[in-house]
């Protein structure tokens, strides 16, 4: 039998089980209101769908450069400048296929095996799973309603942390930093 890595011993991501149960119920004709995941509530804009269709039709599909298409990274940089008045160099932007891939890249770049990383509680369950799979120690930081469920300096003074994950907006609370 193949040996199983200790890093793979993560808690199940229960929301996936909930989604599967909902899918089965929908197949049986049940009307389900999905509140289990942060799926977009609207379709992709027509201009985006048209652009993607055009690109697929005119170009061969294949791998992009590893950090993401330079034109897309430049547009993301411009968006940050327009929206937040932030001068962000496109070379500092990495485009991923989803947040989990971005978490893995970020945590791998920032922490070494065995480092202690604080996460606010409640928090997105995947943070804990990803940190554990990277052999990082997760330290729960109990957050409070009066702080909008965000960690504050007083919450982290005695935890001997190598880093802290601050999410804004936070999942599952939806709270945001000012």
Where do the PLM segments sit?
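N-terminal small-domain helix-loop-helix segment of the aminotransferase-like
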Residues: 4, 8-98, 105
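Short glycine-rich anion-binding loops that position phosphate/pyrophosphate groups of nucleotides
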Residues: 40, 100, 124, 168-172
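Glycine/Thr-rich phosphate-binding loops of Rossmann-like dinucleotide-binding domains
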Residues: 43-45, 103, 127-128, 173-174
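Conserved PLP-anchoring active-site segment centered on the Schiff-base-forming lysine
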Residues: 109-131
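A short helix-loop-beta submotif of the ANL/AMP-binding
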Residues: 132-138
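Active-site phosphate-binding strand-loop segment of PLP-dependent enzymes
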Residues: 143-178
């Amino acid at each position: 039998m193949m040996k199983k890595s200790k890093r793979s011993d993560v808690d199940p991501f229960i929301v996936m089980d909930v989604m599967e149960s909902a899918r089965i119920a929908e197949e049986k004709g049940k009307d389900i209101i999905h509140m289990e995941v942060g799926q977009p509530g609207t379709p992709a804009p027509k201009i985006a769908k048209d652009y993607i269709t055009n690109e697929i039709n005119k170009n061969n599909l294949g791998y992009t450069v590893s950090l993401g298409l330079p034109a897309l990274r430049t547009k993301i940089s411009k968006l940050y400048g327009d929206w937040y008045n932030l001068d962000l160099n496109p070379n500092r932007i990495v485009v991923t296929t989803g947040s989990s891939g971005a978490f893995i890249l970020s945590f791998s770049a920032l922490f070494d095996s065995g480092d202690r990383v604080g996460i606010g509680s409640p928090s997105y369950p995947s943070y804990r799973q990803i940190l554990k799979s990277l052999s990082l120690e997760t330290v729960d930081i109990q957050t409070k309603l009066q702080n909008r469920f965000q960690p504050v300096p007083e919450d982290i003074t005695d935890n001997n942390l190598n880093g802290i994950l601050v999410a804004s907006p936070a999942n599952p609370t939806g709270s945001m930093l000012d």
